[in-house]
Amino acid sequence: MATTLRDILDKLLGRQPASAKTARERLQLVLAHDRSDLSPELLDQMRREIFEVVAKYVEIDLEEGEVSLETEDRMTALVANLPIKRSQAKAVSSQENGASSQEAVSSQESVSTPGAME
C-alpha cells in the first residue's frame, strides 16, 4: 500500500478516495488478516506492546502511530508506522546511572562497621 503522488494530492485537496479503491484496500486488509490467522484482538494487543517497547527508547506520537498488516505479492507483513517526537537516550542513560548509584549506596550501607555488631 505505497503512497502515490495522486494519493498525496488527493489528501491535500481534500478529495475522497474512490469507492472501488476503498473497497480494494478493505479487501486486502481482510485477506491479510485471514492469511496471518491473527484475530483483531491479538493484533491490538501486539500494537499496544510494540508501542510500549518503542516508548522505552524514544518518545512516540501515540495518536498518529499505527500498526497494520499489509499484503503484497502474496506476502503478509506487519508494518509499524510510529512517528518519533524525540529520543529518550539521555533519560535511559540517566536512569541507568541512577540505578548504579543507588546500588552503590545500598551496598555501602550493608557493609558492617567494626564494633557495630558488638
From Swiss-Prot:
<dbReference type="Pfam" id="PF03776">
    <property type="entry name" value="MinE"/>
</dbReference>
<feature type="region of interest" description="Disordered">
    <location>
        <begin position="86"/>
        <end position="118"/>
    </location>
</feature>
<protein>
    <recommendedName>
        <fullName>Cell division topological specificity factor</fullName>
    </recommendedName>
</protein>
<comment type="similarity">
    <text>Belongs to the MinE family.</text>
</comment>
<keyword id="KW-0132">Cell division</keyword>
<dbReference type="GO" id="GO:0032955">
    <property type="term" value="P:regulation of division septum assembly"/>
</dbReference>
<dbReference type="GO" id="GO:0051301">
    <property type="term" value="P:cell division"/>
</dbReference>
<keyword id="KW-0131">Cell cycle</keyword>
<dbReference type="InterPro" id="IPR036707">
    <property type="entry name" value="MinE_sf"/>
</dbReference>
<comment type="function">
    <text>Prevents the cell division inhibition by proteins MinC and MinD at internal division sites while permitting inhibition at polar sites. This ensures cell division at the proper site by restricting the formation of a division septum at the midpoint of the long axis of the cell.</text>
</comment>
<dbReference type="InterPro" id="IPR005527">
    <property type="entry name" value="MinE"/>
</dbReference>
<feature type="compositionally biased region" description="Low complexity">
    <location>
        <begin position="99"/>
        <end position="112"/>
    </location>
</feature>
